[in-house]
A protein has these predicted regions:
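A general structural signal for short secondary-structure junctions and capping/turn motifs
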Residues: 25-27, 92-95, 255-256
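A short, flexible beta-alpha/helix-coil linker loop
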Residues: 41-42, 109, 206-209
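Residues in well-ordered alpha-helical elements
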Residues: 120, 243-246, 344
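Cofactor-binding active-site loop characterized by glycine-rich and histidine/acidic residues
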Residues: 62-65, 69-195, 213-219, 224, ...
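A general secondary-structure junction signal
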Residues: 106, 267-269, 350
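Glycine-rich ThDP/TPP pyrophosphate-binding loop and its adjacent helix/strand module
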Residues: 147-337
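Conserved acidic/glycine
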Residues: 1-87, 273, 282, 287-380
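Structural signal for conserved beta-strand scaffold positions within catalytic alpha/beta enzyme cores
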Residues: 38, 104, 236-238
Length: 380
C-alpha cells in the first residue's frame, strides 16, 4: 500500500464496462447496391420523375459530348467528362429543394447545369478563367472544386451554420472515389457526424482515381462502409440506375432535414470516357471492360423501363434528343463568341491593394507572355 493510499487520498475504482457509443448494425450498408429499374420497386417510381430524369440524362450525354468537342477546338482548356455517370449527376441536382446547396467537384459540371446554371457559365472555369462563371448564391451551387475533396468541409460548414441559424437547408456534397483518400474527406465526415450537420455525401465510385483502381485506394469492403467509423449510415446504390440514386439521395436528404444527421452514399458507376481530354485511359484499362459497362448504360436502363411501362414512345425520345441538340448548338455558338481571356485579370481581385509579391508575379507573367509572343512571331 502506498503512502497516498494510507492517507485515504487515493481510492482506486474499477473502470466502467466499455459500451459502444453507437450501435454499428443500423449504419452498415447493404451487401449489394440498391436498384430500382428492372425490379419490382420500379412500379412505385413516379412516372413524371422518371420522364424528367430521362430528359436530363439525354441532355447531359449530349452536353458531355459537346464539351469534349470544344476541348479539341481549343475553346476549353480541359473537360473532365461524366459520360456514363449521368444518373448520379442528374439525380443529385434534382433531389434538392431550391433552398438547398450543391457542392460539386470538378467532374460535376453536368450536375451544375441540371441545377439551373447556364451551360456556358458552367464551363467558365474549365476554359481557363480565374472565376467559376456563375453566382453561387443565385443557384445555391458552390464553385466547382478542382482540388480533391476541398468542397466537403465547405459543405459541412455551410450546413452546420444553417442549422445554427434555424434555416431549413440541406447541403449535398459530391466527390469521387479518389477524393475519399484525402484528409478533407475524413475531416468533413467526422465533423458532420459529431455535430449532426444536415449534409449528404455522394461518392461517385467510378473505379479509378485517374489511373489508380479502387483496390489500390482502400481495403474497406466498400466506401459506404467507411460511414460506420464516423457514426453515420452508409448506403450503397447502383450509380447507373437514376431512379435508385434519386430515391436513396431523397431518403438521405429527408433524414438530414429532419435532424437525423449526415449520410454517406456510395454510387457504383463507371467513367466511360478518359479522366480528361489529356488522359490516355488505354494505359490502365482495356476495351472489354469499357464495353461491359456500356451494356449497363444509365440512359438505356431508364429508356427500357419507360418504354416497357408505356411511358415513352419514339416521339417522346426524339423530343428529348432534339432538346438536347438545341442546347448543344446554343452552347457551341456562344462558346465560339466568347472574348479572349486576359491573363492579367488573375491578379485583379486577390487583394484590395496588391502586395509587392503579387505585383512581382504579375510582371513575371507579363514578361513570359511577351517573350512567348515574340517567339511565335519569329517563327517562319
Amino acid at each position: 500500500m502506498t503512502v497516498m493510499e494510507q492517507r485515504g487520498a487515493y481510492r482506486p475504482t474499477p473502470p466502467p464496462a466499455w459500451q459502444p457509443r453507437t450501435d454499428p448494425a443500423p449504419l452498415l450498408p447493404d451487401a449489394e447496391p440498391y436498384r430500382v429499374l428492372g425490379t419490382e420497386a420500379a412500379a412505385k417510381a413516379d412516372p413524371e420523375l422518371l420522364r424528367r430524369l430521362y430528359a436530363e440524362l439525354v441532355k447531359g450525354r449530349r452536353y458531355n459530348a459537346q464539351a469534349t468537342a470544344l476541348t479539341k477546338q481549343g475553346r476549353l482548356a480541359v473537360y473532365p467528362s461524366s459520360t456514363g455517370q449521368e444518373a448520379c449527376e442528374v439525380a443529385a441536382a434534382l433531389v434538392l429543394e431550391e433552398r438547398d446547396w450543391l457542392f460539386p467537384s470538378y467532374r460535376d459540371t453536368l450536375a451544375v447545369v441540371a441545377r439551373g446554371v447556364d451551360p456556358v457559365e458552367a464551363l467558365t472555369l474549365l476554359r481557363g478563367d480565374w472565376h467559376t462563371g456563375y453566382d453561387p448564391h443565385e443557384h445555391r451551387v458552390a464553385p466547382l472544386s478542382t482540388p480533391l475533396a476541398t468542397q466537403l468541409p465547405h459543405a459541412v460548414g455551410l450546413a452546420h451554420a444553417a442549422r445554427l441559424k434555424g434555416d431549413d437547408v440541406v447541403a449535398l456534397a459530391m466527390v469521387g472515389d479518389g477524393g475519399t483518400s484525402e484528409g478533407d474527406f475524413h475531416e468533413a465526415l467526422n465533423f458532420a457526424a459529431v455535430w449532426q450537420a444536415p449534409v449528404v455525401f455522394l461518392v461517385q465510385n467510378n473505379g479509378f482515381a485517374i489511373s489508380v483502381p479502387l483496390a489500390k485506394q482502400t481495403a474497406a469492403p466498400s466506401l459506404a462502409h467507411k460511414a460506420v467509423g464516423y457514426g453515420m449510415p452508409g448506403r450503397l446504390v447502383d450509380g447507373n440506375d437514376a431512379a435508385a440514386v434519386h430515391e436513396v439521395l431523397a431518403d438521405a436528404v429527408r433524414r438530414a432535414r429532419a435532424g437525423g444527421g449526415p449520410t454517406l452514399v456510395e454510387a457504383i458507376t463507371y467513367r466511360v470516357d478518359a479522366h480528361t481530354n489529356a488522359d490516355d485511359a488505354t494505359r490502365y484499362r482495356g476495351d472489354a471492360e469499357v464495353e461491359a459497362w456500356r451494356e449497363h448504360d444509365p440512359i438505356a436502363l431508364l429508356e427500357r423501363e419507360l418504354t416497357g411501362r408505356g411511358l415513352l414512345d419514339e416521339a417522346g425520345a426524339e423530343t428529348a434528343r432534339q432538346d438536347a441538340e438545341t442546347m448543344a448548338a446554343d452552347l457551341r455558338a456562344r462558346m465560339n463568341q466568347d472574348a479572349e481571356l486576359d491573363p492579367m485579370d488573375l491578379f485583379t481581385h486577390v487583394y484590395a491593394e496588391p502586395t509587392p509579391q503579387l505585383l512581382e508575379q504579375r510582371e513575371q507573367l507579363r514578361a513570359e507572355l511577351a517573350a512567348e509572343a515574340e517567339s511565335e512571331g519569329a517563327r517562319p
